[in-house]
Amino acid sequence: VAGICEGRVVVVTGAARGLGRAHALAFAAEGARVVVNDLGVALDGTHGDPNTSTGPAQQVVDEIRALGGEAVAHGGDIATTEGAASLVTTALDAFGRLDTLVNNAGFLRDRMLVNLDEDDWDAVMRVHLKGHFLPLKHASAHWRAEAKAGRAPQARVVNTSSGAGLLGSVGQGNYSAAKAGILGLTFVAAAEMGRYGVQVNAIAPAARTRMTERTFAEAMAAPEDGAFDAMAPENVSPLVVWLGADDSAGVTGRVFEAEAGRVSLM
């Protein structure tokens, strides 16, 4: 039986670990060909030990291929024009099309407001907000050109906000502001790009990742008794795959909370 993303080409940013990895594997399981983007940076965005951080995107590509799927790695910095543009060209060169963009990349530099310096503010705003804007801009330009050439796409964008973007989070002024900005960007992009066959939605997920394990260790811990692992990142991915598929036709400009196996429409 064909998956709901059979024939689609999907780009996932920040896809080497956590939610991004779960999304990439889930899309591949539903028949998509996947561009796996990741820089392999540490939790705070700095480059870690080169012996442990090299090639994380390729590792996920290898997982997908081992399961019979198709994928390629992309190691560009999506918060640069060159890196974001090459996301699109990588998809086109490898698979001949681009159907879905999942903006997921990010990291944390948590500080209370009075201790938050400009570097920490700028770095977090750059990866989250600019790292959403630039891939969205370049993918949208491609889809607009396709539509104007008479090849109207059924394109999908899934942006990643957070409960911090909806309600704020103590010690995360930079992160909360960036995630709130992503919501505004989502609403504008949905309004502007609908005429070209592009749907744009956002999720506000809660899941166990490198970013949350340290900050919310107790809440994110996996159960020891084999019970349902409510905070596993794989619980969020079915929603993302559906939003990235043809099946979500007509759904745009919306925000979905996904937590502990539950989905709420905001």
List PLM regions with ranges:
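Canonical Rossmann dinucleotide-binding motif of NAD(H)/NADP(H)-dependent dehydrogenases/reductases
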Residues: 3-36
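A glycine-rich helix->loop->beta "capping" turn
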Residues: 5-6, 67-70, 90-103, 109, ...
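The beta1-alpha1 cofactor-binding region of Rossmann-like NAD(H)/NADP(H)-dependent oxidoreductases
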Residues: 54-55, 75-86, 118
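Substrate-binding pocket helix/loop in short-chain dehydrogenase/reductase
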Residues: 112-113, 120-122
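Active-site helix of classical SDR
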Residues: 136, 178
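Residue(s) in the substrate-gating loop at a strand-loop-helix junction
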Residues: 162
